Amino acid sequence: MDEKIAVMDTVDANFKDEWLENVARVLDGAKPDYLVVQHMEPDHAANIENFMKAYPDTTVVANTKTFTMMGNFFRNLNLDGKKLVVANGDSLTLGKHVLTFVFAPMVHWPEVMVTYDSTDKVLFSADGFGKFGALDVEEDWDFEARRYYIGIVGKYGAQVQKLLKAAATLDIQTICPLHGPILTENLGHYLEKYDIWSSYKVESEGVVIAYTSVYGNTKKAVELLAQKLEEKGCPKVTVFDLARDDMAEAVEDAFRYGKLVLATITYNGDIFPFMRTYIENLTERSYQNRTIGLIENGSWAPAAARIMQGMFEKSKNITWLENNVKITSSLSEANEAEIEAMAEELCK
């Protein structure tokens, strides 16, 4: 405890009682002076009003945009005389500890800010450096953090890059995100991953094959391609049936690896709905700097390849394979040769 006590953010509405009990236990009879609100999304801000009922003399610390949102979420919350509005770069002295506020707009909401404690060298990073999963489960940080980043923040790479540049000027020894574990070791690894993800670089060499298949013929083509790639020593091949597998993992791997093959049918003059959803998930998150190959199947008037390619027209730095595959109902010998050529090109 310091001369002044600051509580950082609140929690989801479902954890109200547990959280308030934990706060009271840590305070051990003391009263908090400040509630710092970094992010207004309800999974972190839902208990602001409940906190103020429990500790009515607390001053809420936030920026102007946050207070506007707070009024929209909590129509009956009266904070007259209990607001401290901060600007980017402002500091708040608690005694030994000094908190500095760094604005991080669109990481991933417009009001977001992070807070740096220069005494203990702690970065309270809001949603940044968070991950999915439970704290009592041993798992690879990169996997769930990558999926979290791409799903939640993936569209806002430029804004994350700006925040990383600001963070590079700070001596950070601990990162406290609003999701997932507190990070205390090997911080360079986490910063490096965020730099890769937010600049849309290829993280690992490999090929992702994402497909939909109604009667199994497109699936056979995908299985043959995967077999050929493995035979040729491709470093990593992952295959996703978009109608059955986890869409979020398929999106994650598309951003992780450098090459992507999309295989689907022509369906009602369009592409199969799961494939459309998948591509939209990629393009909405600024998918770029990748190589894409196409496998289309149509019993008559095939249009899937043209439609899929058109969906990436606004994506940056997409390289299209020269060798694509056009199936008419079922695999032919010519198709098998096309798949061989596609595998060869993908392995270059």
Residue ranges of each PLM-predicted region?
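Metallo-beta-lactamase
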Residues: 62-112, 156-162
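FMN-binding flavodoxin-like domain, especially the glycine-rich phosphate-binding loop
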Residues: 135-175, 179-182, 224-242, 250-348
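Short, solvent-exposed beta-strand-terminating loops
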Residues: 120-138
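Active-site neighborhood of phospho(di)ester-bond hydrolases with catalytic His/Asp-centered motifs
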Residues: 8-10, 32-40, 60-63, 123-127, ...
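Structural motif
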Residues: 4-6, 34, 97, 121-124, ...
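Active-site metal-binding motif and surrounding structural segment of the metallo-beta-lactamase
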Residues: 3, 14-61
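Conserved beta-strand hairpin/beta-sheet module of binuclear metal-dependent hydrolase folds
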Residues: 1-25, 114-117, 121-125, 218
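Short N-terminal or domain-adjacent regulatory/targeting segments
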Residues: 176-203, 277
